[in-house]
């Protein structure tokens, strides 16, 4: 099942992160050939999707025993759309506290806690977002992008170029254009997804 965004075109709010998380997980399974049939509401089928290459380029894995550069991970997570928070409770969030890194990957049922020993990932465990207690040991964690569109410099450049092609007038007077140019994803931006690709 590919969930709908459950918003209307040109709403000034974005879909709930749980829905985006489910959508990205489903799109990932489809792109890997793990899903042969997808149930899609008629309204959902009308909207264009991000290309498979976007999902493939912004999906990465972390494995127990792997050497990890925390600063590089922060940059990679920010580029993939993850939000740095003090306590992880929702998909698309991460937190770094000393040798502990909490991640709530898109498409995951539970958040993950990475325990570092020096620069190595000593353990990966799922944890309860409410109690913050660890639950099950894992060998690796898959991190999908946190949104269905790229907000990196190349994505913003494509958006600005296509925005000027599609919409008349001075783009510098558009709040949407200015927000995207500044790297801010305004509410409802998902309906402008074709302008990013």
Describe each region flagged by the PLM.
Residues 1-197:
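ASCE RecA-like P-loop NTPase motor cores
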